[in-house]
């Protein structure tokens, strides 16, 4: 499976996935490239360090969201992506969601009281939650700082992403 990772800033949920690809830990999985919406996205440096091809489709250069979406979709096609992981890019342009419906992996965070519900899912063609591939919950602990809680949430999300990709590769 040839996967592209979409980012808008830093890597949030795909550090472990990048490492898994680098060390070839998932059979049949390769990262075709990381595509960022801005040239200064910190995620690009991490990807380059792991020998992942990087690309920029700079959103601010386009007159509207539709033309940006078409350019992004064309880049994903150019690098032969057959699966996409959206890491912190929201919203994903409608034409990308439509083209990759059922093959666009996203993470949804839902705060509920003193917990954070984390869901990894395949987006449908309308860009909505489709098939749920994994769920986890992080409870706020009395010793947590904002940073430690956020890191724990991201760690859980990273695990869900890797598990979801493994599941999709095995399907």
Regions found by a protein language model. Give the residues of each.
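One-carbon transfer enzymes
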Residues: 1-171
